[in-house]
Amino acid sequence: MKYSLFIGRWQPWHNGHKWLIDQRLKEGKNVCICIRDVEADEKNPFSPQEVESNLSEKLKDLINSGKVKVIILPDIESINYGRGVGYDIIEH
């Protein structure tokens, strides 16, 4: 199964995040929400586990239907890809 990948901190989850995810869901695409495992600070008051729990509750029906997956991802410093990798790069 293929997924549209979204990487973020999601601190806190808000309507802008929902709109972003909904764009792909409306196209019939599955979505994988990756929570960056960032260190707690003023901008990141919630642990990745707390964010995952919050998203799992808010998106319970979509997760249960298999349309959305939520995972914790190690913190990243860049996204790198080669030519012809078999997926689209989409900016919203």
What are these regions (language model features)?
Residues M1-H92:
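Nucleotidyltransferase catalytic core that binds NTPs
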